[in-house]
């Protein structure tokens, strides 16, 4: 949170590695052992890491040239720490306590003060960062603010007091050396999340976070989960004065129940030491915010930390958390409401199975499995020769005795081995589908109007134009095997039906309304019943002819043609792509004037 188009070189230290057990040195008994933070060794490691981080900027590559320029000009570093939650637990401090916050503030102050002291020492050798000249006053003012915050910080006990003393000395050196040498780095410290690297660093907790739960499950990328048990509990119990057998009993209780409530031999006043972010004894959201506020005055950047809130948290409660964080001077704040995501990397428990009673087993009534209906040895069939765009071929369509289509064979003349193989494979696929019950109309709807070469005129009077061989084949199959209603809905009609449409306005075949003898003797059929035609008064013969009734659609295809004035199955123009209009038995394009070849 410094400059746009910049980067921050991060590093983190495992605080538990600097916790010193003084029991052996002072001869104290195992129970209630003394612990201290090795401030001197911690400062030495910070100096070493800061030096390495600054050197790495000279050799690092960056995503964009602008980011590289800004980073080299300001040389921001981001040293931080991890395992603070485990450190506080091991030293007997509750996370949400004055003692815990005092120790966290002391460690952060020592880390940042030591970092800027080493930055000033580096500047004496290799010079300050490029942007220091125009930011000198602001930089030195920030250093004074850090030092003032260190002076005003509250000392709580013997554990944090030596750390505060080392931090005070470091900040005095920062002010003195910074005035003389200037600073090598515009920023020195942040608190990063250390989510995945924390596991590789042997950390029980990440960043400034408390432990999520004493027993937790981590979701793995490849599936499944792994159980993670806090290894700091025995040290904390020892620090609090419990005997080894009591420690074993409490640890066994935690492994079984996941918390310390009602653990054998554990005093209720010590429960708070083992409070976690989630679970039966969860740290309050403001406890997280107060811990961040304890560390923020001693950091160059911000804190990447999650404020855990229960699933029942309201909008007003979340608003209050952000408002309090602003009042306490936090630079950044992130809320995580439990179960707000479908999958979260860490959880306090495995997903519980539904506790509702299992529904009564329902007996399977119908279970459908497709069954192949093979054709008999002797089968009726039709072989059709065709020509599409000059390409000749033969189609054999065999059917069941009940007239249902069962298989199709295709053979193209002058074909090579590749085309012959493709046609055989296509025929087998369609035939097997038909025998397993795939309706022919499904194939027709999918394969008609597919356009590729060869295409054009055919020698079939019922299908004068085809946009491809596949288009022709399934139009021919539809005409041979589908009922009128089905293929009419698909826009497929024979030459006779198209002629009837031109004469009568309907594709449907005429109904036999009169008997054979009546047909032989009667006049042409009228629109009304025959009886009405013979009894009509003579005067009506002189009346003007009634206007023809509007054309009525009997199916979706005819309705589309009435609305658009076009044939639903008309092809697209080969020249301009416009929908063509039927002209006789062929088609003409109204866009460019092209014809299908015979109009």
Curated annotation (Swiss-Prot):
GO biological process: DNA biosynthetic process
Top-rank EC class of the record's enzyme: oxidoreductase
Record carries keyword Nucleotide-binding: yes
Keyword Cell inner membrane tagged: no
Low complexity bias (residue ranges): 526-553
A GO molecular-function descriptor: ribonucleoside-diphosphate reductase activity, thioredoxin disulfide as acceptor
Keywords: Cobalamin, Cobalt, DNA synthesis, Nucleotide-binding, Oxidoreductase
Disordered: region residues: 519-555
InterPro entries from the UniProt entry: RdRp_reductase_class-2, RNR_lg_C, TSCPD_dom
Gene3D superfamilies: 3.20.70.20
Reaction(s) catalysed (UniProt annotation): a 2'-deoxyribonucleoside 5'-diphosphate + [thioredoxin]-disulfide + H2O = a ribonucleoside 5'-diphosphate + [thioredoxin]-dithiol
Enzyme Commission number, as recorded: 1.17.4.1
Binding sites annotated in the UniProt record for substrate: 193-197
Cofactor requirements of the protein: adenosylcob(III)alamin
Pfam families found in the cross-reference section: Ribonuc_red_lgC, TSCPD
Record note on cofactor: 5'-deoxyadenosylcobalamine (coenzyme B12).
Role of this protein: Catalyzes the reduction of ribonucleotides to deoxyribonucleotides. May function to provide a pool of deoxyribonucleotide precursors for DNA repair during oxygen limitation and/or for immediate growth after restoration of oxygen.
Similarity comment text for this entry: Belongs to the ribonucleoside diphosphate reductase class-2 family.
Protein name: Vitamin B12-dependent ribonucleotide reductase
Organism for this UniProt entry: Streptantibioticus cattleyicolor (Streptomyces cattleya)
Gene assigned in the entry: nrdJ
């Amino acid at each position: 949170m410094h400059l746009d188009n910049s980067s921050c070189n991060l590093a983190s230290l495992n605080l538990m590695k600097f916790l010193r057990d003084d029991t052996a040195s002072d001869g104290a008994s195992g129970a209630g052992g003394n612990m201290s933070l090795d401030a001197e060794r911690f400062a030495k490691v910070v100096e070493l890491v800061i030096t390495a981080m600054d050197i790495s900027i000279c050799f690092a590559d960056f995503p964009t040239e602008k980011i590289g320029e800004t980073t080299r000009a300001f040389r921001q570093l981001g040293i931080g720490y991890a395992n603070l939650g485990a450190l506080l637990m091991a030293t007997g401090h509750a996370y949400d306590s004055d003692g815990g916050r005092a120790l966290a503030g002391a460690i952060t102050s020592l880390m940042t003060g030591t970092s800027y002291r080493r930055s000033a020492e580096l500047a004496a050798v290799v010079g300050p960062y490029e942007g220091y000249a125009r930011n000198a006053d602001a930089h030195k003012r920030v250093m004074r603010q850090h030092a003032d915050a260190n002076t005003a910080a509250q000392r709580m006990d013997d554990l944090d007091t030596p750390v505060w003393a080392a931090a005070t000395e470091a900040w005095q050196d920062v002010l003195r050396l910074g005035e003389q040498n200037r600073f090598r780095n515009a920023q020195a410290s942040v608190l990063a999340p250390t989510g995945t690297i924390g596991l590789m660093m042997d950390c029980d907790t990440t960043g400034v976070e408390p432990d999520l739960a004493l027993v937790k499950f981590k979701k793995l990328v490849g599936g499944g989960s792994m159980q993670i048990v806090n290894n700091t509990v025995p040290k904390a119990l020892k620090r609090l004065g419990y005997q080894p057998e009591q420690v074993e009993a409490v640890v066994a209780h935690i492994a079984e129940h996941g918390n310390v409530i009602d653990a054998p031999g554990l005093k209720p006043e010590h429960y708070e030491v083992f409070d976690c972010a989630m679970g039966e004894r969860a740290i309050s959201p403001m406890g997280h915010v107060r811990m961040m506020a304890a560390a923020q005055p001693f950091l160059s950047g911000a804190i990447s930390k999650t404020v855990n809130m229960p699933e029942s948290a309201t909008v007003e409660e979340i608003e209050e958390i952000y408002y309090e964080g602003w009042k306490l001077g936090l630079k950044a704040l992130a809320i995580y409401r439990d179960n707000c995501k479908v999958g979260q990397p860490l959880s306090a428990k495995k997903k519980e199975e539904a506790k509702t009673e299992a529904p009564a087993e329902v007996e399977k009534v119908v279970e459908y499995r497709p069954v192949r209906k093979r054709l008999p040895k002797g089968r009726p069939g039709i072989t059709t020769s065709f020509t599409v765009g000059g390409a000749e071929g033969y189609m054999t369509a065999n059917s069941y005795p009940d007239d249902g289509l069962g298989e199709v064979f295709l053979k193209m003349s002058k074909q090579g081995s590749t085309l012959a193989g493709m046609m055989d494979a296509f025929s087998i696929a369609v035939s097997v589908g038909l025998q397993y019950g795939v309706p022919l109309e499904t194939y027709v709807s999918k394969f008609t109007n597919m356009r590729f070469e060869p295409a054009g005129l055919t020698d079939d009077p019922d299908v004068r134009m085809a946009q491809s061989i596949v288009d022709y084949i399934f139009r021919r199959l539809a005409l041979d095997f589908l009922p009128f209603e089905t293929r009419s809905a698909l826009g497929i009609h024979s030459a006779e039906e198209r002629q009837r449409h031109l004469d009568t306005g309907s594709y449907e075949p005429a109904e036999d309304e009169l008997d054979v003898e009546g047909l032989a003797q009667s006049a042409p059929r009228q629109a009304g019943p025959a009886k009405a035609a013979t009894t009509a008064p003579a005067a009506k013969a002189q009346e003007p002819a009634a206007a023809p009734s509007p054309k009525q659609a009997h199916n979706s295809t005819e309705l589309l043609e009435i609305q658009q004035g076009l044939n639903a199955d008309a092809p697209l123009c080969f020249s301009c792509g416009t929908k063509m209009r039927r002209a006789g038995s062929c088609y003409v394009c109204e866009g460019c004037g092209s014809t299908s070849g015979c109009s």
